[in-house]
Amino acid sequence: MRVVLVHPTGSNWIPGRKDISATANRMAPLGILSMAAWLGAAGTDVAVLDFLGPGAPVGIEAQTRSILAGKPDMVGISATTSSYLDGYELIIKVKRQVPQVR
């Protein structure tokens, strides 16, 4: 099984508020990194995509392509309040293109 774990980008989706999401969420995604280590030790083929990290693809379409390039059987999203909408949109796009992905 191939698992891709994703740390999505995000933004302030409240109109009129300053957007500090990229700064506030710029941290190592320790939760999915821990899960990846455990899954890898158990023999699962796992990848972590940190879309807030350096060199990450920009935009939902490019990020969806990046996820699908890993040919996942399962995709996991780790999201905060500011990134859950991007995470949700990524999952919708992945499932539309490859419905059998869990």
Pin down the residues of each PLM region.
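A short, structured N-terminal alpha-helical element that caps or precedes a catalytic domain
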Residues: 1-102
